[in-house]
A protein has these predicted regions:
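Interfaces and regulatory segments of ATP-dependent nucleotide/adenylate/phosphodiester-chemistry enzymes
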Residues: 2-232, 343-479
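A solvent-exposed, charged loop/short amphipathic helix patch at secondary-structure junctions
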Residues: 276-296
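Extended hydrophobic secondary-structure segments that form protein cores and membrane-embedded regions
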Residues: 325-332
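Short secondary-structure boundary/capping segments
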Residues: 283-287, 341-348
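Active-site beta-strand-loop-beta-strand hairpin of nuclease catalytic cores
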Residues: 260-281
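A short acidic/basic microdomain associated with nuclease active sites
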Residues: 232-253, 258-261
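Acidic, metal/cofactor-coordinating or nucleic-acid-engaging core segments within structured domains
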Residues: 290-324
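Short acidic, S/G/P-rich loop/turn micro-motifs used as interaction or catalytic elements
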Residues: 275-276, 334-337
């Protein structure tokens, strides 16, 4: 509703709403929502449910979930000590990508600590003079705007893609979650703030769509999936290792990015650094969904099936493929589609039929899953170890989905129940927070900047800090 305020023309004869007015409005809202979902007459329960939970499930995540998402994005964009995307980001915004991450991280921490408000004086105290006021203002304006700037952004820069799904589409305020006001920054909701900041860098690049970005991001994304797989209880081969097996067996064809091996099975892992489009999350139409998935998730399924088929021919060199097999496609965004069997039956039956005709079924589609990188990192970040960790988890998913009573809609639901099985109830089962927060490069850098700036301002006149805050406010409000 906050978003809609920037799209409607105020009535000159406004008045305080009565109970009857509110009742009428809510009924109209439900009526509109009913018309929107009436077209989702899919025989598939999964496809029918996707639009209904699209703008609901992410709001229910704890704040720590989106804090981890912010840290994950920093790690993806910084495979080394510097970011290969720094220059590209600076050409478009005038600031380095690394600096942007540090500045918005402080803004996120500060607004959470101050009940969604952050005074400009506080920003100056903890970010300046390490960063110039101009750099701070440019960074904040990527995720914030005055009421006028927000209205222009929503109507012109980022117009609504699907007008008839307004009640179920994700709010576009995710792209500008912060309001610039007199004296302070403000956000209507902490979860909106967390997700908006966590996804800000990638959203910027996706909107710009510069040449070669998707390929370079795909490589960085694959590198981070490799980082997540690096656990003592996960053994795996890289793409080059699988190609070597092909060569030794005298075969050629598609390979997966990773092949996790275990004593009694294997997992074909494919990294796809893609995010869903708004329209595919708001529809149950399989054709529209397939159109986007064709070059990402469906392509990943084809790679997994062909790789499993080809390794059958090399089984003398690689015995793990003779046993139980699973497939896992790790995506950047949440597609609200976690089972390969749903894609095979409800979205791309003709493509899968052709695939089966060519290769048979070397891996059951019930054993292929889709998982966002956020959930995958959450899973692999748990401190508790388990023999053949990833195999054990995917078997857990299959067992739960085999029974309608325990079947899950979201991968994170499987993860939570897996943790409860993995660790007794009298022990704490959370992600390894120490690795995610205290030992993270983004966290360390942000703390260092805040400490240096706080030490600089200690003992200085309050009037000096105030003058700087006024200058920052003017820069933020400038058109």
């Amino acid at each position: 509703m906050v978003e809609w305020l920037f799209e409607v023309t105020p009535n000159k004869s406004t008045r305080v709403a009565t109970k009857r007015d509110v009742y009428w409005f809510v009924n109209r809202l439900f009526e509109l929502n009913g018309k929107t979902t009436a077209g989702n007459n899919s025989d598939s329960l999964i496809l029918f449910m996707r639009p209904l939970i699209n703008n609901q499930f992410w709001i229910q995540h704890r704040n720590e979930y989106w804090l981890r998402a912010l840290i994950n994005q920093f790690e993806i964009f910084h495979p080394d000590n510097t970011s290969p995307f720094d220059n590209e980001f600076k050409q478009a915004t005038g600031i380095k990508l690394t600096d942007f991450f540090v500045i918005v991280s402080y803004v996120y921490f500060g607004m959470r600590a101050e009940n969604r408000r952050l005074n400009y004086i506080q920003i100056v105290k903890y970010l300046h003079p390490y960063y110039s006021l101009e750099t701070i203002a440019k960074s904040i304006r990527i995720i914030a705007g005055t009421p006028t700037q927000l209205q222009d952004f929503l109507c012109n820069t980022f117009p609504r893609e699907v007008t008839d799904t307004v009640t179920i589409a994700e709010t576009r305020l995710l792209h500008k979650p912060i309001l610039i006001t007199e004296g302070y920054l403000y956000c209507a909701d902490v979860t909106l703030l967390g997700r908006g900041i966590a996804e800000a860098a990638l959203n910027h690049f996706v909107r710009k769509n510069t040449a070669g970005f998707r390929k370079r991001f795909g490589l960085a994304f694959e590198h981070y999936v490799n980082v997540c797989l690096s656990r003592p209880d996960i053994s795996y081969l890289r793409e080059t290792d699988v190609e070597a097996i092909y060569k030794g067996a005298g075969i050629s064809g598609k390979v997966t990015d990773f092949l996790v091996t275990g004593d009694d099975g294997c997992v074909f892992v494919e990294a796809k650094g893609v995010v869903p489009r708004a329209e595919t999350l708001c529809t149950a139409n399989p054709y529209l969904i397939k159109r986007q998935l064709k070059d990402s998730i469906i392509k990943g399924i084809k790679q997994i099936v062909e790789c499993a088929y080809l390794l059958d021919g090399a089984s003398n060199q690689f015995s793990a493929v003779k046993k139980e097999r699973f497939g896992l496609i790790v995506t950047q965004g949440e597609f609200l589609l976690k089972r390969g069997i749903d894609i095979a039956q409800d979205i791309a039956p003709h493509e899968i039929k052709s695939l089966t005709k060519k290769f048979g079924e070397p891996i059951p589609y019930n054993n292929i899953f889709v998982c966002s990188i956020q959930d995958f990192e959450y899973l692999t970040g748990i401190a508790k170890q388990q023999p053949d960790f990833l195999l054990a988890f995917l078997r857990h998913c299959c067992r739960e989905d085999a029974d309608p009573i325990t079947m899950k809609m979201m991968m994170v639901q499987h993860i939570e129940t897996f943790f409860k099985v993995l660790i007794p109830g009298d022990e704490e089962y959370t992600r390894l927070e120490s690795r995610g927060l205290k030992d993270n490069r983004l966290f360390d850098k942000t703390i260092d900047v805040m400490s240096d700036c706080h030490a600089y301002w200690k003992g200085k006149l309050i009037s000096t800090t105030y003058d700087k805050s006024i200058s920052l406010q003017r820069m933020l409000q400038a058109t």
